[in-house]
């Protein structure tokens, strides 16, 4: 979900609220969940949105997969490095507001691939 005005977008909130019937039956209990977030700013309150996604997963009794990467926070780090935004709860992506989807920084794309593999590997271990 994108972060928009301090939280996940209204479209995601609509989806989340529509899951209440599944919650009553615990239909997603022990399912694997993961999340990512994008905003135009480097921080942009992405953590708030990820915690909302993680909380929804927890309410459903799900198993949340963290990012599992150390941050790239040395002086030599660039936007081409894995986890250069320093996420831990889930994937963080930053896209300038005037950029096209083809201009997402390579480090964010590579981090997304790494996170997708992690979610798949953990899902396979639990299967």
PLM regions with names:
Residues 1-77:
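Helix-loop-strand module that forms the ligand-binding subsite of alpha/beta enzymes
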Residues 68-127:
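Glycine-rich phosphate/pyrophosphate-binding loop and the adjoining helix
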């Amino acid at each position: 979900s994108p972060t928009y005005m301090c939280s996940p977008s209204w479209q995601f909130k609509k989806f989340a609220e529509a899951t209440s019937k599944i919650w009553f039956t615990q239909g997603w209990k022990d399912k694997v969940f993961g999340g990512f977030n994008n905003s135009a700013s480097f921080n942009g309150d992405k953590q708030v949105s990820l915690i909302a996604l993680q909380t929804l997963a927890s309410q459903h009794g799900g198993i949340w997969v963290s990012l599992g990467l150390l941050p790239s926070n040395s002086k030599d780090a660039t936007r081409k490095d894995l986890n250069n935004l320093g996420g831990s709860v889930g994937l963080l992506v930053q896209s300038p507001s005037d950029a096209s989807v083809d201009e997402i920084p390579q480090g964010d794309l590579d981090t997304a691939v790494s996170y997708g593999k992690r979610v798949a590997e953990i899902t396979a271990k639990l299967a």
